[in-house]
């Protein structure tokens, strides 16, 4: 599942864009929310981030990962359920499709109560940058983005 | 903060010209024309990508006859398979023949995901086949791809022209450069030429109604022999290549 | 809490049969057939409403030739004007010829608003003309109108059938009763009959490709004389009236 | 703009449905958020509510109206503006169209900065029931719905 590299690139690019905008000289840490639905291979993502950060403002950055459980709510019957309740029913290629495009959950997952594919992903869809800490002109800056 | 948005311009950086094939109206030939145009540009030695953005009803793969076993390769992202010299991306690789009950918001989220992980590489043209309507997909492609051009498809029917007029007004408001209008399924005299004039949009030419098209679908060699394909070549030469659109 | 949702069943309570005309695919004739069906049911002395739900590209008014000055009347809500014995509601009354850049979420919000304030009164049939796709509008009509029936339109093209197959699978999953499939723009032999059989959906009949249709658009008298209109009468008699659908 | 009657009906029906569900015997008050975009004629709405409540569980209910300013955010340039900034530019029939269907704002209103009709209605779209107070078996019940 080596497309984690592409996700790492998008994280690094985004952090660099924000650092530039906020005049951050050196990024100290980046907090990344990892939605369970996308089934990221965390080790690969970490390796990619550590390789990509070299020679950038992120050189010294620590990456903090916060895993977020995936939860759904049915628009038809309002039932709420968890990805972990239904994950075992997915075939390998179905799980991989969702890994690339989390919205394919609507193709391969149905409400366990009423069978509808028309549901909301309440949380845990994919990757989000939840905070960046860095140094501007010597003083630390905290940002909850 | 969504990390996907800032990488998209990066992923599309080495693509010279991005063209969204739009109409507002369904069933006017957007998918047939997008697919044929990609094939023909490739035969003219251009590097071409084709991205089927109709995530409720993808169908470029049917026009091209892309076999089911062909899949993108995972390599630091997704590399779209090359079929008949065209780099082709579609949600169909993943959803196969299953229902796609994606709401507008989900569809654009899926499009953003694919835009952010697909490695097109160097291209002369990326053709984007849009769904009908002037809804999420059209609005977000305009928002996300700042240098996209619009290529408008219509039939001569009254039922198409009113919707296409709404679309053209919208593209002008949003300052999207319009390459022009292609009239598809023309028979007899054209009202579209006058329509284009009235709307102040370039009329690029007409493709005839062709009842041999249906049996050619899925077979690229047959397709390229149809009257539609042959008429399209002239439009590509005069209206797509070297045309930088009228920014409205 | 949204007060509109609980009034909708109330507003539709005196309507015997609600029919959503759907396809997944654009340009297959949903709008033409919805409009003609409403006219013909009215001529059979049925009380009929027609609601154009394609809020990006409304077009029933073009088929019917509804003049621009006709407007709903405000009276404890909105009363749809009666045109040729059909109570007709459309966003076009309000938006005229302007662009309608509504995202899926906005479109359904607008639909919910109109459903909650429109007073249809007693009707035998309410025909809902849906946009292409299996997105917000289709999903929300199914969610909001629990007793809606689906009437599926397709052309014989391969490009329509794959999308229609996705739609039928979805309707079955969502347990929407399907009245059947109408094959539109038929020429020569039908593949749709076999398709319907394979999908286990009733085949209701075919409407021929008719090149006199275009000039009849907007003129009800001419429209009712077309081959399409005449073929549709038989389908209405045998396939719409007294058909309660196969709940899948 | 007498379609306020239809809106009043939907409010009363919804409150009655909730009251039934929560076993409320008598509704004491209903708080209604009135989004500015819809340009409700409050006097007509009040009259309609007072007429419709007769002979129902709402007989004794007080209606409390909380007006909510309408605000937009452009998806193209992120500009935020208020309905009151642009209201004066609407023609009578345009304002009436928005009165019936607030989403028609996308037809008649554009971002004052960049001209885009692709914006989010941040708040003040239409009518919402924000709270219901009532009596269940003699004891008052509060509900923030
Ligand atoms: N020039 C043409 N002559 C005959 N049939 C055509 C022509 N162009 C398109 N078609 C047919 O019209 C239908 C709609 O075309 P399609 O490309 O799917 O439209 P869209 O993508 O706009 O919905 C298809 O069945 C297609 O085969
Ligand atoms: N039976 C028919 N013969 C010829 N043209 C048709 C027929 N049915 C529909 N059309 C034409 O096909 C186009 C698409 O029809 P429309 O009703 O707008 O489809 P949809 O609502 O599915 O998008 C229109 O130009 C219409 O006039
Ligand atoms: Mg298409
Ligand atoms: Mg859509
Ligand atoms: Mg239509
Ligand atoms: Mg839509
Ligand atoms: Ni991967
Ligand atoms: Ni009113
Ligand atoms: Zn459910
Ligand atoms: Zn703006």
Language model feature labels by segment:
Chain A
Residues 1-29, 36-145:
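N-terminal, polar/charged subdomain of small-to-medium soluble alpha/beta proteins
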